[in-house]
């Protein structure tokens, strides 16, 4: 292996895209084989990116939530085909907006629809029902209260007909609470974080760790990065634990999780299994119909389908990726990125906190460079 080409590309990111800092890590068979950290977590204080830097993961929370839910699936707590309303009654009688009117939904929302973002839900945190719930709770709402407010709003399409990014994985967090009998955060701590040794994974970073958090910067080509005021709408209430966008952790912590999935659910460092290998294979199988594949049209994910909470490579030609079919993972709003390729026994993680995140520029390039580096001498 020779990672010189990857290093040379990464060196261009600060100058060409204006990134304040980044961290790129590569793992083979669960062991780190490459690491490059450059720039600052706090540019103004000259605090560099380091192994213990904590990143706001935003949507990279989603694969963790889906893994937790699939643990309960493995225990027979639900079937993917079960109507969601069997567990969360607020979703039993859903309506669909059609023009200026509403009609009853033709299909019930299934649990599979939550995993696959095909439930007809939205990402609207400012709907009339959400506003009323926030007033009624004086902004101290729980995960379940947010989900109950979401259920009062009409769906945008009949469940199962389309794909649309939404609060579906936040609903999965409420489902986990209902079927496990544990608060969502406690479930993750007991069944994901502690077994994997993820010591810095939090929905709300403790005060004694705040000095390790990477700031988010507005970035523009050829200009110095500008620090942005931190805002995460998915941490707006101290009682809300967002299964879709709420977690923060170090790249080293996330590597424990990603490498376990790459090894079929087995964590070599702690000798712990968090999922069965057959379940991991199911998670990374494309679940979308032809119609839904047309909806899943994000430019950085051309050639990918969508499984149970993760993108999954279905066409090398369509993506321009040399990776193995079934390579999977996800990314976060501030530019974090996970690539998991069981065929190559490979994990790559990229950490940054920037707006825009330049996903369509950075992610496919570091992916493509990586596979050549594995064979270089």
Roles of regions detected by a PLM:
Residues 37-39, 83, 229, 352:
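Short clusters of small/polar residues that mark proteolytic maturation junctions
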Residues 36, 338-339, 345-354:
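Short, well-ordered beta-strand elements
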Residues 2, 6, 57, 61, ...:
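Hydrophobic (often cysteine-bearing) scaffold residues that line and stabilize catalytic clefts
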Residues 353-377:
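Generic C-terminus detector
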Residues 3-57, 77, 93-99, 232, ...:
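Short, conserved catalytic-motif segment at the N-terminal edge
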Residues 85-92:
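Acidic helix-start/capping segments at beta-turn-to-alpha-helix junctions
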């Amino acid at each position: 292996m020779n990672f010189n080409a990857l290093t040379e590309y990464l060196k261009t990111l600060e100058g060409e895209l204006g990134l304040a800092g980044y961290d790129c890590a590569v793992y083979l068979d669960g062991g780190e084989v490459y690491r490059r950290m450059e720039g600052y977590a706090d540019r103004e204080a000259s605090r560099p990116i380091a192994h213990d830097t904590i990143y706001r993961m935003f949507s990279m929370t989603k694969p963790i939530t889906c893994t937790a839910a699939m643990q309960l699936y493995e225990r027979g707590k639900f079937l993917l085909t079960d109507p969601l309303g069997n567990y969360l009654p607020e979703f039993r009688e859903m309506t669909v907006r059609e023009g200026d009117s509403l009609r009853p939904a033709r299909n019930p929302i299934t649990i599979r629809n939550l995993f696959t973002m095909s439930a007809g839900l939205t990402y609207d945190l400012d709907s009339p029902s959400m506003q009323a719930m926030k007033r009624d709770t004086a902004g101290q709402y729980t995960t379940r209260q947010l989900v109950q407010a979401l259920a009062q709003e009409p769906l945008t399409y009949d469940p199962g007909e389309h794909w649309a990014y939404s609060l579906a994985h936040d609903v999965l967090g409420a489902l986990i609470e209902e079927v496990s009998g544990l608060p969502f955060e406690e479930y993750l701590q007991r069944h994901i974080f502690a077994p994997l040794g993820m010591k810095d994974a939090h929905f709300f970073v403790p005060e004694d760790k705040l000095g390790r958090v990477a700031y988010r910067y507005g970035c523009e080509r050829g200009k110095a990065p500008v620090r942005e005021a931190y805002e995460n709408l998915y941490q707006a209430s101290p009682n809300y634990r967002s299964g879709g966008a709420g977690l923060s952790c170090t790249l080293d912590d996330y590597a424990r999780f990603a490498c376990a999935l790459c090894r079929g659910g087995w964590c070599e460092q702690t000798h712990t299994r968090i999922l069965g290998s057959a379940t991991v294979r199911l998670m990374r199988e494309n679940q979308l119909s032809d119609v839904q594949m047309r909806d899943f049209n994000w430019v950085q994910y051309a050639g990918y389908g969508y499984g149970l909470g993760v993108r999954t490579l279905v066409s090398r030609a369509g993506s321009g990726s040399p990776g193995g079919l079934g390579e999977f993972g996800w990314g976060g709003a501030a530019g974090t990125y996970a690539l998991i390729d069981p065929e190559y026994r490979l994990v790559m993680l990229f950490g940054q906190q920037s707006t825009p995140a330049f996903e369509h520029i950075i992610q496919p390039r570091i992916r493509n460079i990586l596979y050549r580096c594995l064979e270089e001498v």
